[in-house]
Structure formats: C-alpha cells, structure tokens
Amino acid sequence: MTEGMHSNVKEAIKILKELGLPKGQQNERSALCLLSLMNITQDKTWSEAESPLIGITPMMEFCRINYGKEYAPNSRETFRRFTMHQFVDAGIALYNPDKPTRPVNSPKAVYQIEAETLELIKCYNTEEWSELLARYLSNRQTLVERYAKERQQNKIPVQIAEGKEIYITPGEHSELIKAIIEEFAPRYVPGGRLIYAGDTGEKMGYFDEELLRQLGVVIDSHGKMPDVVIYFPEKKWLLLIESVTSHGPVDHKRHEELAKLFNGSTAGIVYVTAFPNRSLMARYLNNISWETEVWVADAPSHLIHFNGVRFLGPYE
C-alpha cells in the first residue's frame, strides 16, 4: 500500500524490488532507509544522491524531518534487523566502512551506500536505467540468492601459551570446540587468550592453569569445567563456553554451577552456548538460560542474545 506516500518513497520501493530484495524489505521503512543512505530529501532527484555515513538513529531522524514519518525509539532494532542487515547482506550498503574493526553492535555503528549501487541509482528514471540495472545484477548475486552467506568480519586469532599446542581428535564434539577456537573467538573475542579446551582426546586437552589462577580462579579436581574458557583482556571478561552436540546447553542449573565454580574470578563472566547448527539449537531452545549468549557454527558471523541490556558482556 503506497497511497499517501511521497513519490520518492514509492520509487525507492520499486528500486528495492528491482534490486532483488525480498518482500520483507519492499516496504516504506526500507524505502526510507534507502533514501536516508543517499540523503535524498523530498526536493531532490535520484541524480543528486550522496553517500554519507549514517547510523540508525540519524536514519530515523531523517525519516521524521524529511518525510514526516516518525518511528518510536524502540524501532531501532527493527531498522537494524529487518532492513539494514539485509541491505548489507545484499551488498547495497556497507557496515562500518570507516572502521571495519568497530565492535559488533557498537552505538557508533554506521552504514553507507555501496559505490556501484549509488552510481546505478543515480540513473533511475533515465533511459539508461534498464540496461545499467541488468549489467549491475549480472555482476552480483541478489540478496534472495545469497541470503545465507555470512558477512565478512575482521578476525584476530586467539592466543595460546607459548610452546603449547592443541590436538583435536576426530568427532563432532571436538570439531565444534575447534570451530569455537578458530571461528567464534577471532570474531567476538579478538586477541583473546585461550585458557581451557576440553574433550580434545584428553580430559585436560589444553589448560593454562596459571593464567586462570592469576584471574582468581582455582579449579579443584571435582569441578566440571565448561568445554572452552577464553579470557578477553581488552574487556576483562572470562567467557565460559559449552559446546552442545549431545549434552545440554547452559541451562539454569549449569549457569549456577559455573557461577559457583568461577566465583573468585576478577574478570566479568560471560556465558555462551555453542551449537553446530540451528536445528540442534531448536531442540534445546526452551532450556537455554537467560543472560547467556548463543553461537551457531554454521552461521559464525551472528550471535544470539538471550535477554538483558547488553549484547555481549558479563552480568553483575
């Protein structure tokens, strides 16, 4: 329904459709996001499109000031999850092009229209549009075709103690632990230090006991360690990660066990459950404790947050 919309908004919806965006992004909100990415106000034409760096809140302000469309402050997540995420995956917008290493979900996050997309859209409503659109689409897959592709993230390997090696034995559980160390940690704990990795052929596959002691934690022989423990020096966080292939996730009972086991930690505790895929995660969804994070190995560049005010961080 486009009745009552400004012509720029109506045309932006048509552009999104022609670019191959799914129906969920062929709407007024997404059209206004596209207009804000190019700073196209009511008095401007497509040929006047620009490429400013712009965050979610400024986008919402743009909608209100220039098109009289006011969104509630709690709509920010809707903008992010149901429009801008798809724009980035489609390659029509860039995420933090000024600083790619900016942390996930930083309040300083910004977006920018992608250069080729900008040049194409400048030609909308001209005789060249159809030909240029066909050429543009032939050089890139549309979002519908590549929706499940992960976005690239800058990755910094986790550090292990000098002179130590980790041996991963074959098996689904060990493979997931390997993915946590090689895929999860570089994305979400860049520059982190591995303290413990269990179930790698030995009961104590890898254990930097001295570093853990320096953080105020001494584990007795009866304490059931999580599968992976990583220290994040930059944030002074200690991540306790359970890898789930057959046994359960960090549920309420396990949350309490780990809290007691790591009670002396001088670093803030972050609880994470890792699954190999979303179908296995779905089986355990009702058991996952609140105030934890969930990571799925087959979608490594995404993190699922269970409640609370922080996206990733310890709870006091």
UniProtKB/Swiss-Prot annotation:
Gene Ontology biological-process annotations: DNA restriction-modification system
Superkingdom to which the source organism belongs: Bacteria
GO molecular function: DNA binding; magnesium ion binding; type II site-specific deoxyribonuclease activity
Enzyme Commission numbers on file: 3.1.21.4
Keyword annotations from UniProtKB, A to Z: Endonuclease, Hydrolase, Magnesium, Nuclease, Restriction system
Swiss-Prot/TrEMBL cofactor(s): Mg(2+)
Keyword Magnesium: yes
Pfam families registered for this protein in UniProt: BsuBI_PstI_RE, BsuBI_PstI_RE_N
Record's catalysed reaction(s): Endonucleolytic cleavage of DNA to give specific double-stranded fragments with terminal 5'-phosphates
UniProt subunit comment: Homodimer.
Family designation: Belongs to the BsuBI/PstI type II restriction endonuclease family.
Name recorded for this polypeptide: Type II restriction enzyme BsuBI
Species of origin: Bacillus subtilis
